[in-house]
């Protein structure tokens, strides 16, 4: 028999210590990884609830297990809220991740060997958009499009690739592109060759929900997303679409039983909480600050002599090329980590370095904005980053920045009292 007094610390000190240390790291370090954020205590409460005990294979009111009357309510709430958030006619909230959501779309709409046109990983795409190390590039014939010399997507070049290769599906989406996608143009290109259009809005879903980035749902056949990142929910995925009974049936079957078994009801509950939070007016103000903070940081980097791929940002992230500084992404990542500033090394277009080394770093503002950083704070942070990178082997500079980071983080706790 269990008691509510049971806790990890009294039973598993090693694990408890690792969790405590991670909590300290999150409070004491500045988090600039573009795909990370802090979810609310409400979201975490749902994830830690008794719903983790319940198996619920199938969909609401059509389960293969008994006792699902309450988890049906949970999933229906999540579905209704996310449909409202993105003006979608269809929603599946069961994908365990964004990659699982993408895999389900491939399974639903394509056959092995079909041609897919997506953004090159080296130019800002995602592994699941056709990378040769992913299922998307191993099971399917993947063709990549990229960015031009100005760091922008060349839609005429995309159209030419589509005409040449006649893909069955075109993917619009990215993991490191700082500009706004033209979904109308992607729709026209897809229609010109009779292709499906899938949009992966994982990185910008929060901006879309707040009306600060174009909504892809009216243009795409299918839209996928994660529920963390800018959406600030639990780690998970969703699939959205306009009304299309044929596609809806294929998508549902591709998730269950096609690629997943029982849904994670505790995570779906957390998604429902996050979707309700995203419907609040305060969420729009948060997203506005995310974008303003990103634009501010980009201007500081440019003023300090650093190259931003595509010349700036129109969303929450930027890709900083270090080629002109003679630095690698790995060296920059390691030095900034010692200063308690967390970024991730990232390949840049035509990168001479390997993916394990890279010539760039990706920076995003969702997490620091959640903890309350505004324009004044992000100016400081951007300048501290430049201070470290300008003298990357100077441990005294790194220590000085780390002390400043500690003071700033203490002023803006992630989880206050």
Curated annotation (Swiss-Prot):
Modified residues (N6-(pyridoxal phosphate)lysine): 229
Highest rank taxon of the organism: Bacteria
Molecular functions (GO terms): glycine hydroxymethyltransferase activity; pyridoxal phosphate binding
Signal peptide interval: none
Keyword set, alphabetical order: Amino-acid biosynthesis, Cytoplasm, One-carbon metabolism, Pyridoxal phosphate, Transferase
EC numbers for this chain: 2.1.2.1
Main location: cytoplasm
Reaction equations catalysed: (6R)-5,10-methylene-5,6,7,8-tetrahydrofolate + glycine + H2O = (6S)-5,6,7,8-tetrahydrofolate + L-serine
Subunit architecture: Homodimer.
Protein name as catalogued: Serine hydroxymethyltransferase
Native species: Dichelobacter nodosus (strain VCS1703A)
Gene name linked to the record: glyA
